[in-house]
Amino acid sequence: MFKFGKKLMTVVLAASMSFGVFAATTGATDYWQNWTDGGGTVNAVNGSGGNYSVNWQNTGNFVVGKGWTYGTPNRVVNYNAGVFSPSGNGYLTFYGWTRNALIEYYVVDNWGTYRPTGTYKGTVNSDGGTYDIYTTMRYNQPSIDGYSTFPQYWSVRQSKRPIGVNSQITFQNHVNAWASKGMNLGSSWSYQVLATEGYQSSGSSNVTVW
């Protein structure tokens, strides 16, 4: 969520789940995320398969996306954003949470007028691009476990991903790079989604995830 506008989720389908040994993980989506803080108008459509679309106007904060009920560090996310057109603040991002420790994380491939930043930690090369690594902190803010204090981990692409082409996020590359900076994720994985998020903006998005 935007670091200046954190919110609660409408539906959290994921339960705590710990993993020992992981293999690279792909597969059909099984989780639909559709949350808004009630500001403005957000029209989200849960399409067939891994497709979703959202049109928004003069919103507060919202997040819409498709993904997986149970996360994994080995997730390989494939997607095609046929449309991603924010007017104002918006992200096209791989997004999720861990517990033990409670951490919120992002891999941001595209954005609107605001490119997220934080405390700079370095870079990681992945999937044909270079990402800047940042951390931020949230103090007594809503989370998947109620109001808590927790870090956010970010990988933000230096240049925006092209729209309308098949794209891939190899999450393990980011997990490894974060760990090399002392940014260790938790041992219990909640949901993961390829999301469109907006804050005080308008726009449209149409994304297929697999």
UniProtKB/Swiss-Prot annotation:
One of its GO terms (cellular component) is extracellular region. Residues 24-210 form the GH11 domain. One of its GO terms (biological process) is xylan catabolic process. This enzyme liberates reducing sugars from elemental chlorine free (ECF) and totally chlorine free (TCF) bleached pulps from eucalyptus, sisal, and flax, which makes it a good candidate for the enzymatic-assisted production of high-cellulose-content pulps from paper-grade pulps. Residues 1-23 form the signal peptide. The active site is at E104, E197. Belongs to the glycosyl hydrolase 11 (cellulase G) family. PANTHER family: ENDO-1,4-BETA-XYLANASE A-RELATED (PTHR46828:SF2). This is Endo-1,4-beta-xylanase Xyn11E. It comes from Paenibacillus barcinonensis. The lineage of its organism: Bacteria, Bacillati, Bacillota, Bacilli, Bacillales. The gene is xyn11E.
